Amino acid sequence: MGVLAQVFAVFFNRSEFFLYYHVLYLYAMFWILLFGVGTKFFPMLTLTTPLSDNRKYQILSKKVYNSHLFWYIFSILFLVTFIFEATRYQILSLWIRAILVLFLSYEAWCLYFPAQRKGIYTFFIKLFLYTIVIGHFLFPLFSEHKQHLYHILFVGGYLGLVLIVVGRVLISHEKLDLTLEVKSKILATIFTLIYIALWTRATAYLVKTYENHLKYASLTALIAIILFIIFFINHLHKRYKTSKKEL
């Protein structure tokens, strides 16, 4: 839908469709992709799966929670909020989405349930997700600054949470030390830098040195990514050397 809107905007000179492209392609597609997958990943990484004792905390019955129809309807409603975001009903759509995100964070992400796994990963997953939930209530309250505040989602969700998931996959599939995700100070530093970059970018519009703040945020995030790559290359190399000796 986002690409189709861009086609109308570019090839048919219909500039009003550019807003739909912007919202549907740049926001909705990545949002739904990441957090749709996250519905399974986030509870698994923190060991707060709905199949555990946390089921007693949830609003939905097990039958409704496992219903594909319910989540299809939920997803369509969620998508509709993005469509209406590009219209005069922007504020209303942002409020509805904020409520849907709050519901999703409770029922699917199990964000407010006791986590059985403690450590670096659990702390930062919850920190990023709490910030994203709060951010969705800031969007309608400060809609005139939405393009800046949306970086709470871009940096916290698309960067921070994706790196957490990538790191977990590497640790699991490459049989690295599982304690890395529990007490690694380097990983803690990396995710702290990303969180600093998040707020540096989201609040850049508040200061006179706007462009400098964009540079600070970009540089901080870039340093975090480089450290992340070096960290896992180093551990993968050690793992490879150990495997070679065992052969």
Spans of features found by a protein language model:
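Hydrophobic alpha-helical transmembrane segments of multi-pass integral membrane proteins
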Residues: M1-L247
